[in-house]
């Protein structure tokens, strides 16, 4: 099977490409805006249907791991569908997110209604899913995965910046503000699910959808304390809601503005504190628990135990070239 991985320079895409290239059944090629010096790599703008159509010729499937801003996610998905239909690329495996469920709480299955009201990220992901439905209506095959918070080695979002906030005393035991379910899923488990989805039979006109989160994933407070102990960011502080609100709403916007300005200036090596996005305050207290029975039973995902994922994450964070120091090239402009 010839497989093209879009967004292959990102956290999940890069690991997926490694795992695909180790299989006996896949011939994998990576693609992103940043070219790598390898024969199995394409440089392209995933928002350009013409570039995508040229790149997709001859591929049996494409995995969409594109991240970034709203245009990259939503417009990129629409461009991908247009290109795949044009050149008869038969299958898209699309990486979505649990953010499409909005502020839902309780045990959430894949048939729960989508809600794009949490912000630009959830809105863009909902639009991308709509594009996949359009692809299927026109005769294509699509499968969608909705992971929770992807941690493990290489995760700047859910290990790197969390660890740095813990080291700085800006995060710890949040009390009721951190009592939501973390819905953590190891990056290798996401990639395992993508590999399985590439070969899963799909009924015509239907899109199989799978939530991804480890069944033993803890609540956010437990994860913060566990990670702090594992990286020796102790003592773990007990933080009140007022302190978090001030950090997110007063300090967050200017830090984010400075980060974006310095990136535009090409000053990627400058160290800045990580901005605390206000949206995370809602996530950490949201009692949403992804139901992953379909991924366990239909896909056959074998989940990484939380203790092993925590150990892997801490080892990566504390390694000499790990994530313990924040520089602009490590920062990711997503929620």
Region spans (language model):
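N-terminal Rossmann NAD(P)H-binding glycine-rich loop of SDR-like oxidoreductase domains
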Residues: 3-22
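Conserved Rossmann-fold cofactor-binding substructure of NAD(P)-dependent oxidoreductases
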Residues: 42-60
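NAD(P)-cofactor binding segment of oxidoreductase domains
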Residues: 62-95
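Catalytic helix-loop patch of NAD(P)-dependent Rossmann-fold dehydrogenases
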Residues: 105-151, 173-175
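Substrate-positioning beta->alpha
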Residues: 127, 156-161, 177-199, 207-211
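NAD(P)-dependent short-chain dehydrogenase/reductase
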Residues: 138-144, 148-182, 187, 227
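Mid/C-terminal beta-alpha module of Rossmann-like enzyme folds, strongest
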Residues: 200-275, 292, 333-334
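Amphipathic terminal alpha-helices
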Residues: 285, 290-297, 304-335
């Amino acid at each position: 099977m010839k497989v093209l991985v879009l967004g292959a320079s990102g956290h999940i895409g890069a690991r997926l490409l490694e795992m695909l290239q180790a299989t006996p059944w896949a011939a994998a090629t990576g693609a992103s805006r940043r070219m790598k010096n390898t024969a199995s790599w394409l440089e392209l703008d995933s928002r350009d249907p013409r570039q995508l159509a040229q790149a997709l010729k001859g591929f049996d499937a494409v995995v969409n791991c594109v991240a970034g801003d709203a245009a990259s996610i939503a417009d990129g998905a629409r461009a991908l569908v247009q290109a795949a239909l044009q050149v008869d690329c038969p299958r898209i495996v699309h990486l979505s997110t649990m953010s499409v469920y909005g502020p839902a709480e309780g045990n959430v299955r894949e048939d729960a209604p989508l809600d794009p009201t949490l912000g630009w990220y959830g809105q863009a992901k909902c639009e991308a899913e709509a594009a996949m439905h359009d692809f299927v209506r026109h005769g294509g095959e699509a499968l969608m995965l909705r992971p929770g918070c992807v941690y493990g080695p290489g995760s700047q979002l859910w290990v790197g910046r969390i660890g740095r906030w813990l080291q700085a005393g800006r995060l710890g035991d949040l009390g009721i503000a951190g009592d939501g379910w973390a819905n953590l899923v190891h990056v290798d488990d996401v990639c395992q699910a993508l590999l399985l989805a590439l070969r899963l039979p799909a009924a015509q006109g239907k899109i199989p959808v799978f939530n991804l989160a480890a069944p033993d994933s803890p609540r956010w407070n437990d994860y913060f304390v566990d990670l702090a102990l594992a990286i020796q960011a102790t003592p773990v502080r007990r933080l009140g809601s007022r302190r978090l609100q001030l950090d997110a709403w007063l300090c967050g916007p200017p830090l984010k503005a400075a980060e974006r300005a310095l990136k535009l200036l090409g000053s990627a090596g400058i160290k800045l504190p990580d901005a605390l996005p206000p949206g995370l305050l809602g996530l950490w207290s949201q009692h949403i628990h992804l139901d992953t029975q379909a991924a366990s039973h239909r896909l056959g995902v074998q989940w990484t135990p939380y203790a092993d994922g925590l150990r892997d994450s801490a080892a990566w964070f504390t390694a000499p070239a790990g994530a313990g120091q924040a520089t602009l090239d490590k920062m990711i402009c997503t929620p």
